[in-house]
UniProtKB/Swiss-Prot annotation:
Protein name stated in the entry: Stemod-13(17)-ene synthase
Binding of Mg(2+) 2, residues: 553, 557
Composition bias type Polar residues, residue spans: 1-10
InterPro entries documented for this protein: Isoprenoid_synthase_dom_sf, Terpene_synth_N, Terpene_synth_N_sf, Terpene_synthase-like, Terpene_synthase_metal-bd, Terpenoid_cyclase/PrenylTrfase
Length: 816
């Protein structure tokens, strides 16, 4: 039995219902606020945040959204002093005494820091890092190349001298290829006659680090090493085989979309296409250049991904749709900016599929084999991020035999595990990798993910190859918005929890000693598919029905006598005419009154949304469910084992109880769910696959307990069929046979996940009659089963309580 919950009463829950049977007793019921899209969206002002977003305290929330939206619509990377310096060193062809890009030289002259450096620090304290040293040395070289800015050069050399120890310190984070690029430029500077105020032994130490890098046995293959050496070509200068390097040139004329590498090739090989790329780049951007160009698609996708991870993407839905439309167009045109870059391609594929775009896995074919990684720069650097992106994207396969995604999933998971075990993953990235491997796409709890991402969020940006640290340009604003929304959501959830507790007391559900009635975990189960605050009505209905169906399941699973079961089924069958039946026990009366009155109230709310009565549909779902549970109770009493899986699942799917839970919440999502959609084959498939996932997951986890009582279970059926044993035989299957049967059932679960995934995330091109929000509710509901049945049956584990507390009750712990 799946343990879910969610439904919400928009206002005070009356002590006496005008819609049905009078509740057993009257209590004081906690009122709830009316949560609308406007209030959930955040008309709250004067933001109060702590931790590393504290500088934004008091800002209006709409002002923050404007800043984030502006950055999202036109993501611009910070200028890279390092790359600008290399572009500044390119001479005019045929006139080596003149800079080809004087605007870059001028920008360098105008942007030296007071301490003599160029570049940006990696943290709030402004400490010197290797990126600043690298950028400063490059800018000094650029100015000295054209014999300008002598005072700038002197101050730059002085800064490098004062901080030279940073360059030697192996504990300091370094841009990619630092030991090659810094030493190469140092050699070039010394050749120009520049004097560094440092000891000769320190300079020798830098050159020794260069030799160590050349001799280092890094990751990947020989091809990966060649690609890496091409990428840091500016640090090799005349030592580089520039004809070999040009094999990496892209259609836009660049090398790796890197201005610095491309500028070095223009200097040493006089390549016209490289020069054309730089001309185009500087004409677009003016004086400075970024570390990577073009990079708009990746940067925007990263920001979209960040907004989703932080739980605030709904505030920017239109902007995100525009970005994904543009990305889809680029995907369909097979543009290099997306298709050649591992991380960009994987992230684009994942986000497009998750948002309903029709993208084929053929676009990922170039990464189907592990060699695509082993031969890349990423392998040489043991770069985890592209690997993680590939693994995440591989989870989105709709077909049973999608060999491309299956291969990617297999080899990327293996490599990620190897990196974890060998401690090759950055500490800041380790929690995300561990989480991705432990919790597949269908096992995640969005609200819990949001919390973890908020608490780990780094407002100082992230490190990029050769360019130091970059951010979205709105990191502090993103964090402030996320903290504000999480706090607001928690306040809504906490009011809902108090309401659910008062609802339990009102109907006397706490008097049912046989029943698991746990509001906190029930609300958690509702939050998996329904975490936005404005979905409060749907969430409360979901929570209530989780508790009610769990109560009924416990009743049929030993909590009631056969006489009570027959009486209860008759009451549900008669529904509005239940008065003609009567109650044979106090427990039956409590159960029926709670179900009947709660359903009446929620259906009254749903009628306001749907402009029609939905009671008959919901009552029918209750009738189907209790009949199935009664059949299971009769099977257990007679020790009957169904002859086939078809016979078993015809009862097992409806007894999993999604029928009363999902439809009512779907009616309360705030948009029309037409009757023809509910009656459509598509809706039936969604319900069937979600129910199958839950039922089979439950069976896998409860087999050991149920085989002892000879309770029907899909694992038991598979094991008996494999052993050719009699269905009525009380002899349990052997452990080996049972494990093989578990494997068969797990494969059936995966098949249902794929079918459900395909139905839910299909392209919104009009081919689906069921609204997207309703389809996603089925997906989220199936996820609840996976979350709750990962280890043991149902609500009891301490981990479940901890998860519920983290989402609903516990305050955030932000980085300081």
């Amino acid at each position: 039995m799946m343990l879910l919950s969610s439904s919400y009463s928009g206002g005070q829950f009356p002590g006496v219902s005008p819609l049905g049977t009078r509740p057993k007793r009257s209590t004081t019921v906690v009122p709830l606020p009316v949560v609308t899209r406007a209030t959930a969206g955040g008309v709250r002002n004067n933001l109060e945040v702590v931790g590393n977003a504290g500088t934004l305290q008091g800002m209006d929330i709409d002002e923050l959204r404007v800043i984030v939206r502006k950055q999202l619509q036109g993501v611009e990377l910070s200028p890279s002093s390092y790359d600008t310096a290399w572009v500044a060193m390119v001479p005019v062809q045929g006139s080596p005494q003149s800079p080809c890009f004087p605007q870059c030289v001028e920008w360098i002259l105008q942007n030296q820091q007071e301490d003599g450096s160029w570049g940006h620090s990696a943290g709030p304290s402004g400490e010197v890092n290797k990126d600043i040293l690298l950028s400063t040395l490059a800018c000094v070289l650029a100015l000295n190349t054209w014999n300008v800015g002598q005072d700038h050069i002197r101050r730059g050399l002085s800064f490098i001298g004062r901080n030279f120890s940073v360059a030697i310190d192996g504990q300091c984070a370094a841009p990619v290829g630092f030991n090659i690029t810094f030493s190469g430029m140092l050699h070039l500077a010394i050749g120009m006659g520049l004097k560094f105020p440092v000891m000769e032994t320190d300079i020798d130490s830098i050159f020794r680090l260069r030799e160590v890098e050349f001799e280092r046995d890094a990751g990947g293959t020989a091809s990966a090493r060649k690609a890496f050496m091409a990428y840091v070509s500016e640090g090799l200068g005349r030592e580089q085989d520039w004809d070999h390097v040009m094999a990496y040139q892209r259609k836009n004329g660049s090398l790796f979309n890197s201005p610095s590498t491309t500028a070095a090739s223009a200097i040493h090989s006089c390549n016209d296409r490289a020069l054309d790329y730089l001309v185009s780049l500087t004409s677009k951007l003016g004086g400075p250049v970024p570390a990577i160009h073009p990079d708009k698609v990746y940067s925007q996708l990263c920001m979209v991904d960040t907004l989703e991870k932080m739980g605030i993407s709904s505030d920017f839905a239109c902007d995100i749709r525009d970005i994904l439309d543009m990305t889809y167009s680029c995907w369909m045109q097979d543009e290099e900016e997306i298709m050649l870059d591992m991380a960009t391609c994987a992230k684009a594929f994942r986000l497009l599929r998750m948002h309903g775009y029709d993208v084929s896995s053929e676009g990922m074919a170039r990464f189907a084999e592990r060699s695509s990684f082993d031969d890349s720069i990423h392998a040489y650097l043991n770069d985890t991020k592209p690997l993680l992106e590939l693994y995440k994207s591989s989870q989105l396969h709709f077909l049973e035999e999608d060999l491309i995604l299956e291969n990617i999933s297999s080899w990327s998971a293996k490599l990620l595990k190897q990196q974890l075990s060998s401690n090759k993953i950055m500490k800041s990235l380790m929690p995300e990798v561990e989480y991705a491997l432990k919790y597949p796409l269908y096992s995640t709890v969005d609200a819990l993910e949001h919390r973890g991402n908020i608490e780990r969020f780094n407002v100082n940006g992230f490190q990029r190859p050769k360019s130091g640290y970059c951010g979205s340009g709105a990191d502090k604003e993103i964090l402030a918005l996320a903290v504000d929304k999480f706090h607001y959501n928690q306040s809504v959830y906490q009011q809902e929890l108090r309401y659910l507790e008062s609802w339990v007391a009102e109907f006397g559900l706490d008097e049912l000693k046989f029943a698991r009635v746990i509001p906190l975990q029930s609300l958690l189960s509702a939050l998996v598919p329904l975490f936005p605050a404005e979905l409060s009505d749907a969430r409360i209905a979901f929570s209530q029905n989780c508790m009610l169906t769990t109560m009924v399941d416990d009743f049929f699973d030993g909590g009631g006598s056969m006489e009570e079961m027959v009486n209860f089924v008759a009451l549900i069958d008669e529904w509005d005419n239940h008065g003609e039946i009567g109650f044979c026990s106090n427990n039956v009366e409590i159960m029926f009154n709670a179900i009947y009155n709660t359903t009446k109230r929620n259906c009254a709310k749903a009628a306001l949304v749907q402009n029609r009565c939905v009671m008959d549909h919901i009552a029918k779902q209750w009738q189907v469910m209790v009949r199935a549970m009664k059949t299971e109770a009769e099977w257990a009493a007679s020790r009957h084992i169904p002859a086939t899986m078809e016979e078993y699942m015809s009862v097992g799917e409806p007894s999993f109880a999604l029928g009363p839970i999902v439809p009512l919440s779907a009616y309360l999502l705030g948009e029309e769910l037409p009757e023809e959609a509910v009656r459509s084959p598509e809706y039936g498939q969604l319900l069937r696959h979600a129910s199958a996932v839950g039922r089979l997951l439950n069976d896998v986890m409860t087999y050991e307990k149920e085989v002892l009582t000879w309770t029907p279970n899909s694992v038991l059926l598979q094991a008996l069929a494999a052993a050719r044993g009699g269905g009525e035989s009380p002899t349990p299957p052997s452990p080996a046979c049972a494990e093989a049967a578990r494997g068969e059932v797990r494969r059936a679960i995966q098949a249902s996940w794929r079918d459900l995934h395909r139905l839910v995330f299909r392209d919104d091109d009009g081919s689906s009659i069921v609204p997207r929000a309703c389809r996603e509710l089925f997906w989220g509901t199936a996820k609840v089963a996976n979350v709750f049945y990962q280890e043991v049956d149902g609500y009891t584990p301490k981990a479940m309580r901890g998860m519920a507390n983290a989402v609903i009750l516990d305050p955030l712990h932000l980085q300081q």
